Amino acid sequence: MAAVLYSKAALKALLRLPPDVTRKIRLKFEQYAAAPESLANNVKALRGEQGVLRLRVGDWRVLFTEDGIVVAVIRIAPRGDAYD
């Protein structure tokens, strides 16, 4: 199981979200860290950004990188703003 680390910007965004959304995001990342190969995770690589992946959680997008040992969350944003 990979360790999940959050950037300062990601933590700030997480603290501003409603508690139920925060819980969903954390649960989804725990599921991803436990079984990254599962198709239920709905993870895709972003085009144009080397090594950056996105995880869908409802209307929210979580952008992150992974090296097998550590999953580093870069950004958490609403669907429309996540790719700017």
How would you name each of these model-derived features?
Residues 30-55:
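A short, surface-exposed loop/turn module that caps and links secondary-structure elements
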